[in-house]
Amino acid sequence: MKIGLLEDNPAILDYMTTALQMAGYSVEAHTTSASLLDSLLTGEDLADPLPYDVVIVDLLLPGNMPGLAAIEHIHQLISPKRLPIIIISACSQVELEQVKEKLPDVPVLRKPFKMNTLLQLIEKMKPS
């Protein structure tokens, strides 16, 4: 199973990449929304096949496109059923509740979370 991981904090990115690889997943790490979105496209067309089975996105990202905007952009390109997304974030509980209202079908994990919790979510999203 291939995972696209968007996280701007190098320490968290390294930890999560290593943990996911040790769990048997192939991981492509991205530090910007632009990098992740570019990986989903071939030129101006959607990559076929998609490079990932699941995408994990941090909400709090520097630059012009925060995580929520990246997720909305991905959903414009690809059905959420075709490319599931998991949100990770250190936002406040109130902010995360607002995100859950906006994206009710996207699971949200508040940092810090247990890696086992993330692994269980990924397992639920495995393609059949």
Question: Language model features by range: what are they?
Answer:
Residues 66-81:
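Short amphipathic alpha-helix used as the core "switch/output" element in two-component signaling
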Residues 10-34:
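Two-component/phosphorelay signaling modules centered on CheY-like receiver
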Residues 29-54:
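Acidic, metal-coordinating helix/loop segments flanking the phosphotransfer/catalytic sites
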Residues 113-122:
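C-terminal output helix
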Residues 50-53, 78-84:
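His-Asp phosphorelay/catalytic-motif detector in bacterial-type signaling
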Residues 7:
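Conserved acidic carboxylate
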Residues 58-60:
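Active-site residues of response regulator receiver
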